Amino acid sequence: AATGFTPAPGQVWTQCHSYAFDLSVFEMWGALLHGGRLVVVPESVTGSPADLHALLVAEQVDVLAQTPSAVAMLSTQGLESTTLVVGGEACPAEVVDTWAPGRMMVNQYGPSETTMYVSMSAPLVPGSGPAPIGVPVPRAALFVLDGWLRPVPAGV
């Protein structure tokens, strides 16, 4: 993939999110369609950063998809080889600076109306500021429009 993140057979993914949240689709099918193993995380565990961290380490999770707010509450210790995919909200620079060193970390963007995500960033780099939304996925396009639905110039 152009992003540098490619699901692969044998990876261990988590299913942390409610089925009502579109990120759950990425979690489930990202693992299952690529020959991975899906760890279904109980709601009681997702609500406890310490318990979630312990599960991630014990299950040797390879791919973790989380909101930046949730991952900001987790320790990186023991998760050095875990690929992190953030989405669902803007990802602040502090989260990138904490989680990007030494690992694949990408940002997905897409309103629920797009049924998951429409863009993915290149691998994020510490010290580069807030995470960009990246480039459109194949067969998609992104446009920035003004209040009258007219295209705005680059950089606006």
Name what the model sees in each region.
Residues A1-A154:
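Motif- and composition-driven signal specific to adenylation
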